[in-house]
Amino acid sequence: VLSPADKANIKATWDKIGGHAGEYGGEALERTFASFPTTKTYFPHFDLSHGSAQVKGHGKKVADALTNAVAHLDDLPGALSALSDLHAYKLRVDPVNFKLLSHCLLVTLACHHPAEFTPAVHASLDKFLSSVSTVLTSKYR
């Protein structure tokens, strides 16, 4: 459960990310593919090379979904319901991959915003991404 302090940290961090969310999403996705090659199996039709427009485009979709989630911190299941359906019923993404991408997103944010990435912010963002992952995998059961 996200505390009021977590919600404040998440919103403040996302505000600082601003227009870079799509860029960071693409970078995190590329980092995920490089660090965890098995994640590539869900994207056989993508050009997965460094700087790929397809990876950047999908990274922007990830970032847009997270931006929507940040705007609905009190109703993540409602905000992410359609995305949960897509990943559970159509794409059938292994739930572990959400944790891997979450980790890579945290690393990406820490690289770009080291001063703001305090232990408290890190913990809040980790809880947020874990909550998002839980919602996205809730319909697998």
Swiss-Prot record:
Expressing tissues: Red blood cells.
A single GO BP: hydrogen peroxide catabolic process
Residue positions where N6-succinyllysine is found in the record: 7, 11, 16, 40
A GO MF term: iron ion binding
Residues with N6-acetyllysine modification: 16
Function per UniProt: Involved in oxygen transport from the lung to the various peripheral tissues.
Protein name as annotated: Hemoglobin subunit alpha
